[in-house]
Amino acid sequence: MTTITIALSKGRIFDETLPLLAAAGIVPKENPETSRKLIIETNQPNVRVVIVRATDVPTYVQYGAADLGVAGKDVLIEHGGEGLYAPLDLNIAKCRMMVAVPEGFDYENAVRQGNRLKVASKYTKTAREHFASKGVHIDLIKLYGSMELAPLAGLADAIVDLVSTGGTLKANKLVAVEDIMGISSRLVVNQASLKVKRETLQPIIDAFAQAVEK
């Protein structure tokens, strides 16, 4: 029996992937929010789910530790996508990648005057490419969380981060000033697995595709 391993991260992506898994006849036996297990069995004896950090999903799939995974476009851009086949935009976990600054900071004027800006982000590749395309000189500061704190603490002039409702920005007196791109999560597949296990993997991929189209 061919074993299939699916890499998912906790939280919104896991929750929004459940209906897609169900469409493929796959139901995890436990919820990662309440279980301490990192390998979760499913109702299909040959399918298991591994729970990893969102940023690690592409790596697990790339190196074959997982055959399939679900990862945000933001994560895939930073990863680079080597060794991955990304056949399907799942249209889940949607948000925007944006530039935000403190209220009262004249971002347009700073850019117009050619000021060198300090920008904090965990999406350093995306941030670097965005500002380079605009001809804006920046000092990039890589952070791993609490991005909104950076301008408040004087660490950065601006941040590049994911924005869903804008509530967190507003609560920290920040405003979005540029929309970089829309973000949603994609199905990613290990290229070698697709060749070796196509008979088992393709029906899962097809079921996901049909569920997304509905």
UniProtKB/Swiss-Prot annotation:
GO molecular function: ATP binding; ATP phosphoribosyltransferase activity
Subunit (UniProt): Heteromultimer composed of HisG and HisZ subunits.
Reaction it catalyzes: 1-(5-phospho-beta-D-ribosyl)-ATP + diphosphate = 5-phospho-alpha-D-ribose 1-diphosphate + ATP
Main location: cytoplasm
SUPFAM superfamilies: Periplasmic binding protein-like II
This protein's encoding gene: hisG
InterPro entries per the UniProt record, alphabetical: ATP_PRibTrfase_cat (IPR013820), ATP_PRibTrfase_CS (IPR018198), ATP_PRibTrfase_HisG (IPR001348), ATP_PRibTrfase_HisG_short (IPR024893)
EC number: 2.4.2.17
GO cellular component, one term: cytoplasm
Statement: the UniProt record of this protein carries the keyword Endoplasmic reticulum: no
Function, in words: Catalyzes the condensation of ATP and 5-phosphoribose 1-diphosphate to form N'-(5'-phosphoribosyl)-ATP (PR-ATP). Has a crucial role in the pathway because the rate of histidine biosynthesis seems to be controlled primarily by regulation of HisG enzymatic activity.
Pathway: Amino-acid biosynthesis; L-histidine biosynthesis; L-histidine from 5-phospho-alpha-D-ribose 1-diphosphate: step 1/9
Subcellular localization(s) per the UniProt record: Cytoplasm
Protein family (similarity comment): Belongs to the ATP phosphoribosyltransferase family. Short subfamily.
Domain remark in the UniProt entry: Lacks the C-terminal regulatory region which is replaced by HisZ.
Gene Ontology biological process terms, A to Z: L-histidine biosynthetic process
Record protein name field: ATP phosphoribosyltransferase
UniProt keyword terms in alphabetical order: Amino-acid biosynthesis, ATP-binding, Cytoplasm, Glycosyltransferase, Histidine biosynthesis, Nucleotide-binding, Transferase
